[in-house]
Amino acid sequence: MSSTPITDRDTIQTWLDHPTGGPALRGFLERAGSDVDQLAPAYGLPLGKLVDLSGGKMSQEAIDAIVRDANGGEIPVAAEQSASATGHRFEGKTLIITGAANGIGRATARRAVAEGAKVIATDISGDGLASLAEELGSGQVITVTADLSDAAAVDEIVAAADGQIDGLANVAGIMDNFAAIHEVTDEVWARVFNVNVTGLMRLTRAVSARMLENGGGSIVNVASEAALRGSAAGTAYTASKHAVVGITKSMAVMYAQAGIRTNVTVPGAVATGIAVPKDVGEFGNERMTSYRPNIPAMTT
């Protein structure tokens, strides 16, 4: 056993460089018929994140076995790693957060609650929202299971805020199938735009009207690196995220004097659990393959 314990909170790169962790991880992958090269995009992530990223192919029990192998049969107690809140910026505020069941949306909800907010958490995953409410406490989280592609969902989400809406984080989004434009079907185009653009527009339309009545608020839209370049996804997703940036720019101008602050963030690869359809566009996916090694390592 190494004199320096290693846990599932350490990054995969740290594991590979560790005197006992490296052999333990490589040995596990070899027995599973895999190798470390397949983990290259995730080198910067904690080992434990592989449970979520693998879609169930790697269990927590398997991760624990690797940790024990690297630590002489024991699982060391990990140091507490939690981001400290910077205060109570959201005390008395009500925030709506879409895509709150996992990934960026869930992390946003955690931080908002930690800083005193009442959160209206919405997502299509009822199970994910239930676990979020259990984690954060039902007193500060109201969950609304809703599909943003359904126009009726907007009324339900806004009603849950009970009149006061101080902030909106438009995080929810879905991926396309990497299809180039000559491969894009009407179904894929409509599905991506209904959630990423039309759903965002409908909810923001309702929320901004409420904010105008109440004297202001703050809206943050989550786009993607696909809003900055054409080599991150297929045509439908890329176009949808460019649209999100366009909506944000328009709102920033329209409401600058009305007390509504609007911003957009364009994250790179993040372990969000966003599903990628299996029916990938052959031409587009082949083109994207050559660009993937240039994408910065995934983060959480």
Predicted regions, residues:
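Active-site helix of classical SDR
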Residues: T204, S240, T248
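Alpha-helical segment proximal to the catalytic Tyr-Lys
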Residues: A209, V253-M254
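Canonical Rossmann dinucleotide-binding motif of NAD(H)/NADP(H)-dependent dehydrogenases/reductases
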Residues: A85-K118
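Conserved glycine-rich Rossmann-like NAD(P)H-binding loop of the short-chain dehydrogenase/reductase
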Residues: E115-S131
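Catalytic Tyr-X3-Lys loop
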Residues: H182-M201, G216, V220, V244
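Residue(s) in the substrate-gating loop at a strand-loop-helix junction
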Residues: S224
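Conserved mid-core segment of classical short-chain dehydrogenase/reductases
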Residues: M175-A190, E213, A233-A236, V276
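Short, flexible catalytic-loop segment of classical short-chain dehydrogenase/reductase
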Residues: G126, V266-P277
